[in-house]
Amino acid sequence: MAEQHNEPKKLGFAQLAALIVGSMIGGGAFNLPSDMARGAGTGAVIIGWIITGIGMIALAFVYQSLANRKPELTGGVYSYAKAGFGEYIGFNSAWGYWLSAWIGNVSYSVLLFGAVGYFLPMFGAGNNVASIIGASVLLWAFTLLILNGVSGAALINLITTIAKLVPIFLFIVISLFMFNFDKFTFQFWGTSDLGGIVTQVKSTMLVTLWCFIGIEGAVVVSGRAKKQSDVGKATVLGLIGTLIIYMLITLMALGVMDRVKLSGLENPSMAYVLEFAVGKWGAVLINLGLIISLFGSLLGWALLAAEIPYVAAKDGVLPKVFAKLNKKGTPSGSLIITNLLVQAFLILTLVASSTYQALYSVASTAILVPYLLSAMYGFKLALTGETYDKNPTGRTRDKIFGGIATVYAIWLCYAAGLKYLLLCFILYAVGIIFFYIGKKQNNKDAEVFVGKEKILAIIVLVIAIIAIVMLFNGTITI
C-alpha cells in the first residue's frame, strides 16, 4: 500500500515576509555599528548603503517579476537557473545555495551559544564542548519541529521575527533621543588611514554583502505559498523594511558614539552602544535580542536548506534520497542529510575552527551564483519578451531592474575576492558527482551532460584542479 501524505499547510503573506526578514536579520545586524565604522567614515557609509539599496531592491523586483510571470517555477533560485540556462547550471544554483544554507547554520549555532555565554560563562565563545552539546540538542529539536510540518515551523519563525525586532526598534528609538549631530558629522568623509572614498565604500560593501542573504527566502518556498502573488510582495516589502532597519542601526549608532570608538567595540557592538547610552541593561537587552534573532535565523535557514535540494531531487538532478517526504509532507530526506552535515561541522569547530571559517567563507561566496543567475534570467526574459506578449506591462522597468541586478551581482562576486571564488570551484566540482548520480537514478540511459554542459563541467573541473594545486603550493591559503 502506498504511503499516504497529508497535504502540507500553505504559507500566507505574513509567514513569507517573516521568513525573508527572519533569514536576513541574523547575528550580523547586531554588529553593524562596528563593522561599518571600521573601514569607512559616515559619508562613505551612506554611499555604501545607497549602492547596496539600489542593487538589492533591483534584485527584489527581479524576484517579484519572476514570481508573477513564471508562477509555475516553484523551486526559486534553482528553477529560475534551470529554466534560463539548462539543467546543469540549474543544479549548480541549487548546489551553491544548499552549501551556503547549511554551513551558515553552523555559524549561527556558534554565534547563538556565544551570545548565551554573555549570561552563562560555561558556554564561552560558542565553540567549546558545552556549546556544541547545546547546539546539537537545538539542531535536532528544530529537525523534529520541521518534520512535524513546515507550516508550524514557519509560524514559530514569524513569532521569533517579531520578537527580535523589538530590541532593535528600542535601540533605534533610544539612539534617536541620544543622537548628537556633531558626532555624526565629525570626520564625515573619514581619515587618511581609511583611504579614499572609493576604498571606504568598497569596505562597506564587503559588510553589506552578507546582510541581505535571505532575500530569496519566499521564492525558495514559493511552492508552499497560499498565493503566488504573495511571494513577490513579501520579497519586495521584506527587503525594503530590512534595508531601512539596517540603515537606521548604522546611522543612529554614528550619532551616539564617534567612529573610532565604534570601530573598536566587541561583538555584538549594538549592545555596547546601548550600554554607553543607557547603562548595563542596554547590553542585556541587545544580547537577549541577539539570542532570539539567531534562534529565528536558525529555524528559517533550516527550512530553506531542506527545500532547495528536495526540489532539485524531484527534478532528477540530485539523488532520490533528497526527495523523500514524510507523512506531514515535509522533505525528511533532505532535512536529515542537511542536519547531519551541520552536526559534523559543529564537531569540526571544536578541533579545526580555522578550517571551518575558511569553508564558511567559500560557501557564503557560493550563494552569489544563484543570485547572479536569477538576475540574468529576469534580464533575459525582459530582453527577449518571453511572457510579455499577452501582458507587456512593465517590460521596460524589468529590463532596467534586471540590468541593475545583474551588474550588482557581478560586483558582489568581485567583492567576494578571487581566492574564495577559486576555492568555490572545488565545491562545485564535488557537486558533479551528485549531479551524475541524480541523473542516472532518474533515467539510467539518459545523457548526463547535454550540449555545452559538457564544456562547462570540464571548465569547472579544470579550475577546481588549479585551485587545489594553488592550495598545495601555497599560492592561496585557507
Swiss-Prot record:
The keyword Cell membrane applies. The chain crosses the membrane at residues 11-31, 43-63, 83-103, 106-126, 130-150, 159-179, 203-223, 236-256, 284-304, 333-353, 359-379, 417-437, 456-476. Keywords: Amino-acid transport, Antiport, Cell membrane, Membrane, Transmembrane, Transmembrane helix, Transport. It catalyses: L-ornithine(in) + L-arginine(out) = L-ornithine(out) + L-arginine(in). GO terms for cellular component: plasma membrane. Pfam families: AA_permease_2. GO terms for molecular function: arginine:ornithine antiporter activity. It is a multi-pass membrane protein. One of its GO terms (biological process) is arginine catabolic process. Its main location: membrane. It is found in: Cell membrane. Catalyzes electroneutral exchange between L-arginine and L-ornithine. Belongs to the amino acid-polyamine-organocation (APC) superfamily. Basic amino acid/polyamine antiporter (APA) (TC 2.A.3.2) family. PANTHER family: AMINO ACID TRANSPORTER-RELATED, ARGININE_ORNITHINE ANTIPORTER-RELATED. NCBIfam families: 2A0302, arg_ornith_anti. This is Arginine/ornithine antiporter. It comes from Clostridium perfringens (strain 13 / Type A).
